[in-house]
Structures are given as C-alpha cells and as structure tokens.
C-alpha cells in the first residue's frame, strides 16, 4: 500500500517546506496543494539553481510527478499562467502534469484591489498581508457568492455572476475606500482568456487522489504558510485566511483524516516571522542580524525582510498537538554555526511572573520569554549528510529540542540544496 504524507509548517511560515517536499517527492506519484494561494513562496535549490514556486506544487521539478491543486486553494489565473510560462521557459514540462480542481475559488482583480485598499486604510494597524487578494477571495467563498474555476466552463452564467460581484465590490472600493472602480468589461475579457487556458487543466482532484490511493501510490500533501498563521489556531488576527494546520488537508483535498499516514512538521532551528503580529523571542541585536544575514531571511513572495528570533519550544508544542505531528524536520541548522551560545524559549511569564500560555495576539502582550541557554558551536554543519558529521554541541542542541517539544526530529536540513540533508527516518518508509 502507498502512504499519504503531509508536509506543513509549524511556525509562522518560511520554514523551508519547498525543499523538503522536493526531496521527498522522489518517492511520490503526486504532490497536492490543499490551501492558500500564490501568497506562498516555496524556494527550491537543485544543483545550485534556485526556483521559487508560489502556486504550483513543489513536485513539479521531479520528472513524472503529478501536480494537483485541490479545492481548498484560491487560484489567481494570471499568477498561475505566469508561473507555468516561467517554468516552461526553463524546459520544465508543466501542463501535461498539472491539474486543478474546478472547485477552487478564483482570485480576480477586485480581490487584489480590496486587499490592498484595506491594508492602506489600516495604516499602522495593518495585518501585513501580501496584498494578493487571498483574504477577499476566501471571504467570497464563505459568503457563497464567489466564482470558481469550474464556472469558467459556462461563460454566459459566469458573466452574470461576475457582473454581480464587480458591482458588489465596487460599492466598497469606491464608496468606502475612495479607490478607482474595477472595469467589468476588461475583467470579463481577461476571464475569457483564462477560460481557454485553464479548461485543459481542470480535473476532479478529489476523485484522482482516491484513485491514486486505491492503486497503492504514494501521495504528498504540500502545506503553505505555517501553523501559527492558521485562521483558527494562529495568532489571530495576524493570520492568513485558510486552515494551514493538518485539518485543512481533509477539507482542502477531499482526502479524509483516516487516510493520512504521516504528518511531517517543518521547523526552523530558530524562529522567523514576516509582517505584523506577536513574536515573543524576536531579537533586535547583532544575533538577530546574524540570523537574518546567514539565513537570507527575505520573503520569497514579498521580498520583505523577515523578523528573526530564538527557537520557541512553546509554539512548537502547540503546533505538534494541533497537527498530530508524526515527526519534525529541523531546517537551517547551519545558520546557527558560529554562535557561542544559543537560547531556547521554554515558556512565557507575564508582568507578575506567572507562567502563561497565550492563545491569540492580545494574550501575547507584555509576555517575556523564559530561556534555557545551551552552548553553540564554531564548526560548520553545512552539507552534513549524517548525524555523526555534526559537531557534538549541534547534536546536543537537536537532542534538547526533541526533549522540549516531545516529538522526534526525523530529518535535519544542513543547507539549501536537496542533497544537504540528514534523513534519520523517512516519512515514506
């Protein structure tokens, strides 16, 4: 029998999921995205060549691997087609392997305009969205007024629905945000072009996944963003608009929880965050600058500098529970090379010194992290492929992290290339 393996982030995103998905898809027949949109930025480095993917599953660089976009993903046709073209220009065959669920909500021009208008209006209170229309598209889905990929198959009906949506959103754009109106005819013309290009890619992804499962094929489910950005379980309201935790796999693909065999949580050896929101272990000193520089901490989607801080075992324990994590992949261990001492956050205290466990953004206010200091290492870990190649203090750090989070570290990433990896227990084994 095949195995269904989920790869998801356990922090605030940018944990290095793309590399690990690419690594593990050597064993997979298919890779499926199940939530988010082109706000994701998955960076792959293969033989020194960097590729950044936003919407297409990271298995696309593996020959013969089927790439599926499940119903939980919001699809911006223009962004998807740009990504396809860019890959095809590199000689990567995409269209014959990429299939999209007709149930995927569409992101159209008015969603992007609304997203950007809202962030502009919030000023200093902005959430820090990518401004790509993700949230407004999910809102339309939940309000049951959204257009979906499959609607492009019936253009007369699509035109009627689109007119209603453009009128609805222009009312807010013009009347409240004082922004220019979206042109209906221009948007319709664009959608007609999208329809011709997307029709050959449409497929009942849920049915395909179950056919693969029954045929005994290995399937990889690729998460986007991170657990602490989950709309329900994250640091609300500084979150994304989808379920980034393991529950999103079932709803976003149609493959039920009982069919998920292994859930791999991707975790940086330190912590980063892009945009606004609480971050208890954030560093503003030379160590934070070291992590940012050595880790090349700039968002693959937005280019924004990431905030950097010490490893936080508290948020990891929460993510492990919420996702029922089977094992952890610890990434960017090499970024800690050269640090004399390293701190690990083991808890939080409020102003009165009481131990607390925050559940939303407001409950983080005023909290101080409680640190455990461990010795660092001066030797390089870059490119290590076995545990024995790591410095003794690096091995001790890994062991201590395991003890604090209560989950096994099954994979360790020691560099950006797919080959710079230590695999202690293979998820597909």
From Swiss-Prot:
Cellular compartments per GO CC: cytoplasm
Pfam families: Adenylsucc_synt
InterPro entries linked: Adenylosuccin_syn_GTP-bd, Adenylosuccin_syn_Lys_AS, Adenylosuccinate_synth_dom1, Adenylosuccinate_synth_dom2, Adenylosuccinate_synth_dom3, Adenylosuccinate_synthetase, P-loop_NTPase
A biological process term (GO) from this entry: IMP metabolic process
Cofactor binding mode and count: Binds 1 Mg(2+) ion per subunit.
Annotated IMP binding sites: 14-17, 39-42, 130, 144, 225, 240, 304
Top-level taxon: Bacteria
Amino acids binding substrate: 300-306
Keywords: Cytoplasm, GTP-binding, Ligase, Magnesium, Metal-binding, Nucleotide-binding, Purine biosynthesis
Pathway listed: Purine metabolism; AMP biosynthesis via de novo pathway; AMP from IMP: step 1/2
Chain positions recorded as GTP binding sites: 13-19, 41-43, 306, 332-334, 413-415
Catalytic reaction equation(s): IMP + L-aspartate + GTP = N(6)-(1,2-dicarboxyethyl)-AMP + GDP + phosphate + 2 H(+)
Enzyme active site: 14 (proton acceptor), 42 (proton donor)
Chief localization: cytoplasm
Record GO terms (molecular function): adenylosuccinate synthase activity; GTP binding; magnesium ion binding
Cofactor dependence: Mg(2+)
Residues annotated to bind Mg(2+): 14, 41
Listed EC numbers: 6.3.4.4
Intracellular or extracellular location(s): Cytoplasm
Job of this protein: Plays an important role in the de novo pathway of purine nucleotide biosynthesis. Catalyzes the first committed step in the biosynthesis of AMP from IMP.
NCBIfam families: PRK01117.1, purA
Subunit structure, as described in the record: Homodimer.
HAMAP family: Adenylosucc_synth
Family designation: Belongs to the adenylosuccinate synthetase family.
The protein's name in its UniProt record: Adenylosuccinate synthetase
Organism whose genome encodes this protein: Pseudomonas fluorescens (strain Pf0-1)
